[in-house]
Curated annotation (Swiss-Prot):
Modifications after synthesis and translation: Phosphorylated. In islet cells, phosphorylated on Ser-273 upon glucose stimulation; which may be required for nuclear localization. In activated neurons, phosphorylated on Ser-334; which promotes dendritic growth. Phosphorylated by MAPK1; phosphorylation regulates heterodimerization and DNA-binding activities. Phosphorylation on Ser-265 and Ser-273 increases transactivation on the insulin promoter in glucose-stimulated insulinoma cells.
Protein name (record): Neurogenic differentiation factor 1
Biased composition (Acidic residues): 58-77
Residue ranges of the region described as Disordered: 1-93
Keyword ATP-binding applies: no
Keywords: Activator, Cytoplasm, Developmental protein, Differentiation, DNA-binding, Neurogenesis, Nucleus, Phosphoprotein, Transcription, Transcription regulation
Organism: Mesocricetus auratus
Membrane-spanning parts: none
A GO CC term attached to the entry: RNA polymerase II transcription regulator complex
SMART domains xref list: HLH (SM00353)
Motif (Nuclear localization signal) on chain: 86-92
Reported function: Acts as a transcriptional activator: mediates transcriptional activation by binding to E box-containing promoter consensus core sequences 5'-CANNTG-3'. Associates with the p300/CBP transcription coactivator complex to stimulate transcription of the secretin gene as well as the gene encoding the cyclin-dependent kinase inhibitor CDKN1A.
Any Pfam family: HLH
Subunit and partners: Efficient DNA-binding requires dimerization with another bHLH protein. Heterodimer with TCF3/E47; the heterodimer is inhibited in presence of ID2, but not NR0B2, to E-box element. Interacts with EP300; the interaction is inhibited by NR0B2. Interacts with RREB1. Interacts with ATOH8.
């Protein structure tokens, strides 16, 4: 039995090898490319090492800086983020610049405050509120200056000089009680004559300017020692005195009967009430008695020889050379109830002003 050609070829005879296929060629070309890339990488690494040796430690420093920045960024990421610009490190130069800027700013602020205080002092000399012992605050000075400008503008607009009471009411609008008393004392006017019926500065239980007070029948002649305007308890009494020389005397001259002239010691005319205090120096003494009454005594710092009182009260001033004397008020005036007496004394204390 014979075998076919195909079977014999498949089974026993080896096939002849042909030329290399295209796949083998591709694999060999890829190997050559890899070898060339490796050589190029080695050359680049050698060149980089040579450059690093030439440049010294510059790259190392840069790497360290980059590492530090990376560490700081990591720390910042861990900490809560702050709003606004980042804080720079405070070097000596920056610290000196900061101190210099702070010193310049302090000097500018100091000069500004000095100029403001000087301007306010000049304004205090112009406004009608003169006092040797008290100094107006900044806000009170500005308020009084505003009222003074408004009052003068009203006079110029109307062309008529208003009465003294309305002029002082315009000046004292919105001012505190001490400043009102100073203005009234400067214009020689009783503060009770222009206070409104319900003054917000005064407590409601105190009597107003329209209230009637008992006036004692005794009158003291003291030409050398003035009695304060609140001692007379008369709301219509205006002292005919000459105010101290000042810059605003010419403006206020139409409000007085006689022209204002410079004088050192003002003269008081007419019968005055007994002096209750001088410059607001009070000395109260509490002496309990069987009727639970209080005896108040006023201490005055002037010789008793200068007081010329009626003969019926000659026993009050004992000793011509004694520098201090006490006047019991219970011997001069009496009140029906203790509460009314306290209200009168509180009203007198509220009306104190210093000349």
């Amino acid at each position: 039995m014979t075998k076919s050609y195909s079977e014999s070829g498949l089974m026993g005879e080896p096939q002849p090898q042909g030329p290399p296929s295209w796949t083998d060629e591709c694999l060999s070309s890829q190997d050559e490319d890899h070898e060339a890339d490796k050589k190029e990488d080695e050359l680049e690494a050698m060149n980089a090492e040579e450059d690093s040796l030439r440049n010294g430690g510059d790259e190392e420093d840069e790497d360290e800086d980059l590492e530090e920045e990376d560490e700081e960024e990591e720390e910042d990421d861990q900490k809560p983020k702050r709003r606004g610009p980042k804080k720079k490190k405070m070097t000596k130069a920056r610290l000196e610049r900061f101190k210099l800027r702070r010193m310049k700013a302090n000097a500018r602020e100091r000069n500004r405050m000095h100029g403001l205080n000087a301007a306010l002092d000049n304004l205090r000399k112009v406004v009608p509120c003169y006092s040797k012992t008290q100094k107006l605050s900044k806000i009170e000075t500005l308020r009084l200056a505003k009222n003074y400008i408004w009052a003068l503008s009203e006079i110029l607009r109307s062309g008529k000089s208003p009465d003294l009471v309305s002029f002082v009411q315009t000046l004292c609008k919105g001012l505190s009680q001490p400043t009102t008393n100073l203005v009234a004392g400067c214009l020689q006017l009783n503060p009770r004559t222009f206070l409104p019926e319900q003054n917000p500065d005064m407590p409601p239980h105190l009597p107003t300017a329209s209230a009637s007070f008992p006036v004692h029948p005794y009158s003291y002649q003291s030409p050398g020692l003035p009695s304060p305007p609140y001692g007379t308890m008369d709301s219509s009494h205006v002292f005919q005195v000459k105010p101290p020389p000042h810059a605003y005397s010419a403006t206020l001259e139409p409000f007085f009967e006689s022209p204002l002239t410079d004088c050192t010691s003002p003269s008081f005319d007419g019968p005055l009430s007994p002096p209750l205090s001088i410059n607001g120096n009070f000395s109260f003494k509490h002496e309990p008695s069987a009727e639970f009454e209080k005896n108040y005594a006023f201490t005055m710092h002037y010789p008793a020889a200068t007081l010329a009182g009626p003969q019926s009260h000659g026993s009050i001033f004992s000793g011509a050379t004694a520098p201090r004397c006490e006047i019991p008020i219970d011997n001069i005036m009496s009140f029906d109830s203790h509460s009314h007496h306290e209200r009168v004394m509180s009203a007198q204390l509220n009306a104190i002003f210093h000349d």
